[in-house]
């Protein structure tokens, strides 16, 4: 189902895997050889990076950052996102942007379970329309947007720019790409992974750094009895398609 959430990788550290590999090798060199960065090749990356990450030396991942644009998620979702504090965020302001909605589902995220109940869906939409009407009426009567926004439900869609280093991104994906994560933040997490997979320069790091849910990172499901039936196999197969095609 299309929930109207869009994620785009808009920028990342130049030569990200070379940067991370070079930083790893610096640990073993007697001299400070900055010139060697310019000579880093794909062969050097393939020879050293998987091995170093395999040892668990993940601090080197902090030298590469990725910036994503996320649009159409709810503020329920963005509240979960910003709990990951080792990242940078810039979110669309409800104080300076006047909301001018034309359609309820374009303005608010409605869970699929609600959509499957026609009677309940009608009540939801009615309440959402009422909140929009009161918001617009408040602004028209001279109330500041920063006050009028109080009437809007958490379901209102938002836009947010997120920058994470690769190590924090791995932590984020470990928690939020899991099937037990809330469905909306899980969708965002997998869309971020898909954006990385589309990039030839970045794709190898998915496998080498095990960017994905914790079951992929650990080799077992840490949820124990809470693991959804069939999740282990289903998630593993989905993850492998990111770099195997």
Swiss-Prot record:
This is Flavin-dependent thymidylate synthase. InterPro entries: Thymidylate_synthase_ThyX, Thymidylate_synthase_ThyX_sf. The active site is at 176 (involved in ionization of n3 of dump, leading to its activation). PROSITE patterns: THYX. Signal peptide: none annotated. Its cofactor is FAD. Its EC number is 2.1.1.148. The keyword Flavoprotein applies. Keywords: FAD, Flavoprotein, Methyltransferase, NADP, Nucleotide biosynthesis, Transferase. It comes from the Archaea. Catalyzes the reductive methylation of 2'-deoxyuridine-5'-monophosphate (dUMP) to 2'-deoxythymidine-5'-monophosphate (dTMP) while utilizing 5,10-methylenetetrahydrofolate (mTHF) as the methyl donor, and NADPH and FADH(2) as the reductant. Pathway: Pyrimidine metabolism; dTTP biosynthesis. Transmembrane segments: none annotated. GO terms for molecular function: flavin adenine dinucleotide binding; NADPH binding; thymidylate synthase (FAD) activity; thymidylate synthase activity. Binds 4 FAD per tetramer. Each FAD binding site is formed by three monomers. Belongs to the thymidylate synthase ThyX family. FAD binds at residues 59, 83-85, 91, 165-167, 171. A motif (ThyX motif) lies at residues 83-93. GO terms for biological process: dTMP biosynthetic process; dTTP biosynthetic process; methylation.
């Amino acid at each position: 189902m299309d929930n109207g959430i869009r994620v785009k990788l808009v920028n990342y550290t130049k030569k990200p895997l070379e940067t991370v590999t070079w930083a790893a090798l610096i640990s073993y060199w007697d001299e400070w050889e900055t010139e060697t960065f310019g000579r880093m090749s794909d062969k050097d990356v393939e020879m050293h990076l998987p091995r170093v990450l395999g040892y668990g030396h993940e601090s080197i991942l902090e030298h590469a950052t990725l910036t994503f644009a996320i649009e159409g998620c709810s503020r329920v979702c963005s509240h979960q996102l910003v709990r990951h504090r080792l990242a940078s965020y810039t979110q669309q302001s409800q104080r300076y942007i006047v909301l001018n909605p034309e359609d309820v589902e374009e303005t608010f995220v409605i869970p699929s379970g609600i959509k499957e109940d026609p009677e309940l869906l009608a009540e939801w939409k009615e309440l959402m329309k009422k909140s929009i009407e009161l918001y617009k009426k408040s602004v028209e009567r001279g109330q500041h947007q920063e006050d009028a926004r109080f009437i809007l439900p958490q379901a209102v869609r938002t836009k947010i720019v997120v920058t994470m280093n690769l190590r924090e991104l791995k932590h984020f994906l470990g928690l939020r790409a899991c099937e037990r994560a809330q469905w909306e933040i899980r969708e965002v997490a997998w869309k971020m992974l898909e954006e990385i997979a589309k990039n030839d320069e970045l794709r190898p790091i998915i496998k080498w750094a095990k960017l994905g849910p914790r079951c992929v990172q650990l080799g077992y499901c840490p949820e124990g009895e809470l693991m959804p039936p069939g999740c282990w196999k289903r998630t593993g197969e989905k993850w492998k398609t990111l770099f195997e095609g």
